[in-house]
């Protein structure tokens, strides 16, 4: 009986991993075992990065809103509280965009928030 080194399935699996490892330095792009470890690690980092990206963008939006709100004489937390009391449900991404691109509309929202806090 002839010796079988590895069949179609194994070859395809190894080629798939080596294709994913393309561009890695040295043995990480050439040798299957090392490449497999590098690919697994990179996929793990990619998964974690997708979660972190959401947090990072939310932090960025809050920082931008806070800066714009303080320019109008109100803190971020009081601004958000005033909007909630006024029943205005605009997400932080949109508030951030308004703070940067539409200063008049953002100023109007700040005034509404201030009125709700004083009432």
Swiss-Prot record:
CDD domains: Ribosomal_L20. PROSITE patterns: RIBOSOMAL_L20. One of its GO terms (biological process) is ribosomal large subunit assembly. SUPFAM superfamilies: Ribosomal protein L20. It comes from the Bacteria. The keyword RNA-binding applies. Gene3D superfamilies: 6.10.160.10, Ribosomal protein L20. GO terms for molecular function: rRNA binding; structural constituent of ribosome. Pfam families: Ribosomal_L20. Keywords: Ribonucleoprotein, Ribosomal protein, RNA-binding, rRNA-binding. The keyword Ribonucleoprotein applies. One of its GO terms (cellular component) is ribosome. Belongs to the bacterial ribosomal protein bL20 family. HAMAP family: Ribosomal_bL20. Binds directly to 23S ribosomal RNA and is necessary for the in vitro assembly process of the 50S ribosomal subunit. It is not involved in the protein synthesizing functions of that subunit. This is Large ribosomal subunit protein bL20. It comes from Thermoanaerobacter pseudethanolicus (strain ATCC 33223 / 39E).
């Amino acid at each position: 009986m002839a010796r079988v080194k590895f069949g179609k399935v194994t070859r395809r699996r190894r080629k798939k991993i080596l294709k994913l490892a393309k561009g890695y330095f040295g043995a990480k792009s050439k040798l299957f075992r090392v490449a497999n470890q590098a690919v697994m690690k990179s996929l793990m980092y990619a998964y974690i990065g997708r979660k972190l990206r959401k947090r990072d963008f939310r932090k960025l939006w809050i920082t931008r809103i806070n800066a714009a709100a303080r320019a109008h004489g109100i803190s971020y937390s009081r601004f958000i509280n005033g909007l909630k009391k006024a029943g205005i449900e605009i997400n932080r991404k949109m508030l951030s965009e308004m703070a940067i691109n539409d200063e008049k509309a953002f100023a109007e929202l700040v005034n509404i928030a201030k009125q709700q806090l004083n009432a």
